[in-house]
């Protein structure tokens, strides 16, 4: 009697990351379905598409490769148990049973025939037509071979494949034999503790203009640091004692929220944090911690950035947060803030609920990225040194809040105020010219940029305006390209309106941000001009995702 199984379901982006963590490597090919999950909701068996399209590179024609294994056993608990059975000779026992027991042999042959038919049913019409015309030998492999690609249906290639086939809900005598043996030994088909469940964490950051929270599921990324991008954020990993064996994880957002708290408002004049800004920030942190608990996060890390760094009374804020929220507020350095933003762009993978076998990412090659994180009081530039592999960053005192306070006194701003502000931005950005253009750093060539990624509230809001969103949708915003002409037009439209009118602009997902958006857009425009870039890419990931990655590695944060 085969046991009950769940219906086939579409894979989510997070499922592929979980499967890679389960296997200890990335799964080749695409996941078509997940026929079985454990009671903790994690994949136990995945179904893979039978054709892999291989890019030959250097302009060569893209060619298909056969991928005959339909069902993969991914659950490490079951895989380990089946490995024990293999080591004890069960493949030989199954082969002997096939040879001497006619009913078992017929059932085994039927299983292989059915498996081949299921494989063919997965192939799309266009791929099938191509294989019939251009690759008939490959088509025969997919059509005529059995479980795991065996040519002889009387053979048993791998016990794990038969168990995967059986656990997917199919009649498979070898898989049934293995599972029955496990049951007799008291081994069940899932673990007790949910070992594959991603860590759910909360990252809260008190910025100069807003306080934000990200509740995220964090999935380990095995051996990632050992690959071609092995040195990405190595300083962060070393700072927290990582040997490089685990790798930078993937961060999948569960819930994201932000509140305009104005911590840095008026700081330039007084050198102190306003009482209203401190109170609003503490209240937001307290509320966000409650939200995080309700969503099941078990660890939290709370940080503050430029405003808290610059204020002479930041210790008062730290005390208030400790007393009201019973958590330590960590004021991070500008260098560490930049590294966390870089890590966030690399680790951020969109929403945990997103459907698809491949997680979205703007970080195709981290070595070619320039990350520009523009906040309320500062703008950080971060990239990799292509020679040393170290993360390099600089921070400039350019922020949407501080620029608005200093230059944009009228409502709407006058053209003279706008020109004076843009001139100041250009002057300050000269300090980043060599860094942005990848000129020698420490006597070595810095490398060539191919992608500028902008993160932060201004960038996300500009993307939301371009998409005319009613509410924040990180998966829509993530990867959105801001073109120079589009951004100039948006900038003109924003500063031409009074603040009250600006708040009504479609896509202004946080009306409270309307006051500082002309300055935020101007910073990004001037960065594009400095770099000679026709477009920049918006990332919904940033410092919060980087913080979540560090929490997921167990390097920081506290029990929630």
What annotation goes with each model-predicted range?
Residues 120-197:
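C-terminal charged interaction modules
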Residues 37-101:
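Aromatic- and glycine-enriched beta-alpha-beta binding-site module
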Residues 219-250, 351-364, 441-445:
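Intrinsically disordered, low-complexity terminal tails and inter-domain linkers enriched
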Residues 201, 262-297, 307-368, 383-386, ...:
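Helical "lid/coupling" subdomains associated with nucleotide-phosphate turnover
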Residues 199-221, 248-250:
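N-terminal basic/disordered segments at the start of proteins
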Residues 78, 82-136:
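An exposed acidic His-Trp-rich patch
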Residues 2-60:
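Short N-terminal edge-element motif at the start of the domain
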